[in-house]
Amino acid sequence: MLNGRCTVTSLTMHTLLPISNAANRERGSATVTALIVVGVAAVLLAGLMWRQQIQIRTLENARDQVQAQWLQRAAIDFARLVLVEDQRNSQIDHLGEAWALPLADGKVADFLKNTDVPDEIAAVTLQGQLIDAQSQFNLANLWDKSFKTINPPGVQEYGRLLDALGLDKNLAQQTAQGVLQLDMPIYDLEGLLKLPSYSPAILEQIRPFVTILPVLTTVNVNTASAEVLMAAIPGLSRSAAGAFVQQRAATPLKSADEITTLLNKMGASQGITLDASLVDVRSQFWLARSEIRMGRGLFVSSALIQRSQNPLPSGNFTQVIWSKTGKVLAD
């Protein structure tokens, strides 16, 4: 009996062990399967959340872009109002006038204290400035009004500017000829890079001193830098140009005739041949620049405004030639 029971027990153990191992394997497989399912679900959920976040960010960016454009329009309208008011009060343009004061970085809410505006708009910051476009050399002066032939006085003026900047003055003639050969007008300074004579380094060197306007223009001697004055007034030395800038700050010139008077007063008129067609004390083109910080982005805007002494076809005294807004920073 004892041997029989031992035999039965031994057989039972040998029979149960394989069953227990099979159950463990099944439980292990179930655990692995569950982990895989959880992992896949987590990946899918993360993907959905990421796509949702992308969609939300895209909508926010689109909203900010539209709001920034509206704020830019408001800033441009304000700039036009300032320019019209300036023309009513003064027949000359100089850096001591209200238009030349930069708009300090401030919140939109500060400008709309008595207006109920949404919190996200009230927190937006804005800064801007008006720049006299005729304080720079206008590259459009390199050609005649029809843009078919080279304008020699404009080429000579640009050559003097390049020389004042330490660049090859022959680049002026190369520019005038090169653009005509391309038979494609340039609308921004980056267009100069299509010419083999220009490099990004040269472009950055001339950028503060040149612009491109839709028509031939004069240089405003009340706002131009010393380098641009050296270009617009043949024979003007660098030291005389610097002294000219200091003198006009105290007493802005009221007419082109006063240019010669000031040069004589400074003792700097010798060797100077003044071309009245190149200079003036008034301007008609202005660059309005603004920076709008909204949400995660910084929107940089610029616009070219033309002001006329007589009403334009629209009936207004100012008009926007072009405007653009770009998002340059995102957190």
Regions found by a protein language model. Name each.
Residues T9-S10, H14-L17, S29-D331:
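Compositionally biased linear targeting/interaction segments
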